[in-house]
Amino acid sequence: MTVLATAGHVDHGKSTFVNFITGQETDRLKEEKTRGLTINLGYTYFEFKNKIISIVDVPGHVDYFKNTVAGFANVDGIIFCIDSVQGWSNQSEEHFQAISNLKITNIFFVLTKTDLLDTSIDRGFLEKKLNSNKLINYTIEEFSYKTSDLRMFQKKIVDFFKSDTSENPNSLWIDRSFTKDGIGKVITGTASMAFDLNKIYLARTNKLLEVKEIRNTENIVKNTTTTSRIAISLKKNIQDEIGRGDLLTNEIVFSGKYIFAITDKQASKFNKKGSNRLFIGTKNQIVKKLEVVNNSEKNLIFMELPNNLPILENQKILIQNLVSNEFMGGKIAFASNNNNLVKKFFKELRKTESINLEKTFTLLPENLIENSRDYINIANKYLSKDRLESIIKKINENIETINS
């Protein structure tokens, strides 16, 4: 299975294209049908020559942007719709910035409504914009609901997304929960490629999930080797207090409200003024405090959140400045709930222009070190050999005091 999400400005034909390609409507809420507007996430799929393409249809309206980003969690790529009459619009740019900063690099662009006479899409502008980002792999296709060939489009999508380049830690971020008669509580989400369906923890509690049944599309599954849309029916005793924003993992993880993250661009250029929102998987929180860490090796930022958040190292994140609407992407380095450690960190930060992370934290995750050969692995954290020798020397010098 390959899992894709849609993207694009409101009323640029995302749901219409998904309806064409799958034969199914994704707008299921009464308000969505009345207004002709996608509000929440929709889900569907199609099959082509034994290949399943699952699609998460996201809202295009700016008011539902939090729902939009939730739909991007763990997907393999994007179907990006652009109205050939209106051209590149506000939410086109907003969605593109979010996708780019989340490092979702495979994008299938669809120029919609090409049967209308007054089309005005500037294809040269689009290609120039895309070619300026060397990481993006893209194609641009023209689409008309009246004249386009269904099987041809299905084949183009399957062929384009043949190679999986997604890099996500073993996870499933829940994007929907509901109760179904005769089954009980059901949760759904996009499982990353290596996610083990036989050992699932609810990260918020670090307890094994008691599962009744797991399905993808219409089939019961025991495990998966690809990114997959998964529906999990739960046993009765854990049916409450679980829903969108919860993280499922294959290991016990740490929760913290002090977050250190490696950014993809120079963090000092990011506008921190005003409110910032952190998107992580299908979860989002307003950031209480955001600081740029001056460090010679990494583009590092520190965030204080209002609430604890389960943390997976190398989890992709997106930060949005709600004043300037500027975006910054990155990956989680590590998290802590230790207020004293954070105080020590900022004390060191005030004393120097470029902080030495090793001296401040002693143990570091692998993604914050330059050369693992110079470090000792201790419980999946790294300590430099020089620092270890220094610690051993101090212990030996004070051995009598320690033993007294």
Report the location of each language-model feature:
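Conserved catalytic-core segments of large NTP-driven translation/proteostasis enzymes
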Residues: 114, 132-268
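Conserved G1/Walker A P-loop phosphate-binding module
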Residues: 1-55
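C-terminal effector modules of nucleic-acid-centric enzymes and ribosome-associated factors
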Residues: 6, 106, 116-122, 128, ...
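Switch II (G3) loop of P-loop NTPases
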Residues: 51-65
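Switch/connector loops and helix/strand junctions flanking conserved nucleotide-binding motifs
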Residues: 28, 89-90, 116-121, 148-152, ...
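Residue-level signature of catalytic and energy-coupling elements of molecular machines
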Residues: 11, 17, 36, 57, ...
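Conserved Switch II/interswitch segment of TRAFAC-class P-loop GTPases
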Residues: 59-63, 73-95, 104-122
